[in-house]
Amino acid sequence: FVGDDWQSIYRFKGGDVRIFLNLMQNPDWTSYYLSANYRNAKNIMDIAKTVIKQADDVMDKLVYPTRFEMGEVIVDTKNKLKKYLRQIEKDGNYKDWFILVRVNKDIYEISKQLEECDIPYVTFKQGGTSNEELDALMSEDAVKILTVHTSKGLENKNVILYGNFPIKQPSYHRNSDERKIMYVGITRAMDKVIILN
C-alpha cells in the first residue's frame, strides 16, 4: 500500500485513513517513509505544512524540501480574481497555470471571467478523464480549471486556489477534511500559489 494521510481527501467516498494508519501499526508490515519533497519551492511547502499541521487527525512527520529557492505565496480575497487573470493574460504562458476550485459550480464562474479576458482554458471532468485525454489537455497552451480532487497527483508551475475553504467549521471531520483539501491544492504549485478565499 502507498498512502499519505495528509492527502486523504476522499472520506465522502468512504475513504478512511484510519484503515491505512492501522496497517502501519501491524508488526507484519514494514513501513517506508518518503520524506523528500521535490515539487514545491520551500515557502510553498512551509505554508502547506502550516495548514495541514492544524488538522486533528494527521500523523506528525518529517517532510523536507529539496528545492530551497523561494517561491511566491499570495493570499487575497476571491473578488480579486480578475486582477490575477490580467497578470496571466499579460504573461501569456497559459499552460503554466492551474486554477483549482473547491466545488464544480465555481468552474462556470471562472470560465466566464477567463472568456472576458480572452484567456484560453480547458476544464477537466472529475473521474471522467482518461490518461490519454489528460495528456492532451495538459499539453494545450491554456489555463487548466479543475477541482482540487481532480488535481490530485498533478502539478504545475503556478496555481490559483479559488473558493470557500471552510477550515473553521465546528465539526472535527469537516475541519480536518478541509485542511487536507487545502493542503492538496497548495502542493500542486511548484513555484507560485495564489490563495483566493
Feature-to-residue mapping (PLM):
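Conserved RecA-like helicase ATPase core segment
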Residues: F1-G71
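Core RecA-like ATPase module of SF1/SF2 helicases and allied nucleic-acid translocases
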Residues: K90-I194
